[in-house]
From Swiss-Prot:
GO process annotations (BP): DNA recombination
Gene: pre
Name of the protein in its database record: Plasmid recombination enzyme
Family named by the database record: Belongs to the plasmid mobilization pre family.
Stretches with biased composition (Basic and acidic residues): 23-39
Region named Disordered: 20-39
Keywords recorded for this protein, A-Z: DNA-binding, Plasmid
Function: The interaction of the RSA site and the pre protein may not only serve a function in plasmid maintenance, but also contribute to the distribution of small antibiotic resistance plasmids among Gram-positive bacteria.
Position of the signal peptide: none
Top-level division of the source organism's lineage: Bacteria
Additional remark text: Contains conserved positively charged amino acids probably involved in the binding of the pre protein to the RSA site.
Pfam family, one: Mob_Pre
UniProt GO molecular function: DNA binding
Annotated transmembrane regions: none
Organism of origin: Bacillus sp
């Protein structure tokens, strides 16, 4: 049975444009090789028939419900995006209609819980390796943005418990992730890593655009003007500090700046216009450097750096967890074989061994229904039920040994 995945991500104002580009495939992704461009036209939105401007749509939702005149804080969480999905094997078992029903039923559940009027978008991506839905919830409650109250710890637990339960009732073969299991930890870390890579891509694109705009403005301001001038310098005599034979101080002629230039009127007027235009452009650049763009650029750079660091940590954590799980799996497999050998050596026949081992496995199953030991036993039983010549020969050897032991025991009794 596959696991249900619902992950919540907070979005502030400067995040919306980037996630809009990603969700609506408005720009080519450089860091997500999983996107199949030839299938991007199959993506769809359960809320909007056409592409939208995320900032405008979110603003409409807030303004239509807001109570009072207080402005929304610049650093407020405007959208809580839910990413709804499962593993690839789950979707491979569903035909296209059932896949769409899965996302439609998920959307209905969240629209009922958080208010249909608060759902800004519900974009389904089928052009990546695993289909998934980005569902944007504007956390409005009682006329105010209340992200912390709408999506508190209890609500996140509700998402993890009730979503798979609800989808099971609708006929989907899903279960909640095992609490505290290594599998859940690895899957969550992997999903976070993929999501962070997408966020980095979006932030880098946004940063690149803003840098380009600043570069264009700077070039316009710093452009050099070639000005035809006259009488910029004049010839003057200056003392050399030496005297001739008659004692008269010697002088030399040099070109010295007059501090003035003579321009044609048309050149002068053109220069005035360019100076004014340059002053206006310089003012715009100064405003950009001292206000929103510069601050946002610095914020984006910092966030990209933090995301890269987090991404690296998650990759390292994934590696450690995979290694740990691999070691544990090997240890459990060895323990399983040793347990069978131990019990087999202390029972008289195959039937007694099977009964005793079955009781032992049953007790383990009560403590850990989906533990590695139980799963190893299930794999062993499946393999045992598969007919092979090697199994027949092994069974024949066991029967021969049993008959030999019985004959020896009978012979000893007769003596």
């Amino acid at each position: 049975m596959s696991f249900a995945v619902v992950r919540m991500q907070k979005m502030k104002s400067y995040d919306l444009k980037g996630i809009q580009f990603h969700n609506q495939r408005e720009r080519e992704s450089k860091t997500n090789p999983d996107i199949d461009k030839e299938r991007s036209h199959e993506n769809y939105d359960l809320v909007n028939d056409e592409p939208i401007d995320y900032n405008e749509r979110v603003k409409e939702i807030i303004e239509s419900q807001k109570v009072g005149t207080r402005k929304t804080r610049k650093d407020a969480v405007l959208v809580n995006e839910l990413i709804v999905t499962s593993d690839r094997h789950f979707f491979e078992r569903l035909d296209p209609d059932e896949q769409k029903r899965f996302f439609e039923e998920s959307y209905k559940l969240f629209a009922d819980r958080y208010g249909k009027q608060n759902i800004a978008y519900a974009t389904v991506h089928v052009d990546e390796k695993t289909p998934h839905m980005h569902l944007g919830v504007v956390p409005m409650r009682d006329g105010k943005l209340q992200g912390k109250n709408v999506f508190n710890r209890q609500e996140l637990l509700w998402l993890q418990d009730k979503f798979p339960e609800h989808m099971q009732k609708l006929g989907f073969d899903l279960q909640r992730g095992e609490k505290g299991s290594d599998r859940e930890h690895i899957e969550t870390s992997k999903f976070k890593k993929q999501t962070l890579e997408k966020e980095i891509d979006l932030l880098e694109n946004e940063l690149k655009n803003k840098k380009s705009e600043l570069a264009i403005l700077s070039e316009e301001v710093s452009g050099e003007f070639k000005i035809p001038v006259k009488r910029e310098k004049k010839s003057v005599e200056v003392p050399t500090g030496k005297r001739n034979l008659l004692g008269i101080e010697q002088k030399k002629t040099v070109m010295k700046s007059t501090g003035n230039v003579i321009l044609k009127d048309e050149v002068f007027q053109d220069l005035k216009q360019k100076v004014k235009a340059g002053a206006v452009l310089q003012t715009r650049v100064d405003q950009l450097l001292n206000t929103d763009y510069a601050k946002e650029n610095q914020s984006l750079k910092k966030e990209v750096k933090e995301l890269r660091s987090t991404n690296k940590s998650l990759s390292e954590e994934n590696g450690r967890l995979k290694s740990t799980v691999e070691h544990l799996t090997n240890e459990i497999e060895s323990l399983y074989v040793l347990t069978k050998d131990f019990l087999k050596a202390r029972t008289n026949d195959l039937e007694s061994f099977k009964e005793l081992f079955g009781v032992f496995v049953g007790k383990v199953k009560e403590k850990a229904p989906r533990g590695l030991f139980v799963r190893q036993h299930e794999r062993s039983e499946e393999k045992k039920n598969t007919f092979s010549l090697q199994d027949v020969l092994q069974r024949d050897r066991e029967l021969r040994e049993q008959r030999k032991a019985k004959r020896k025991k009978s012979h000893d009794l007769e003596r």
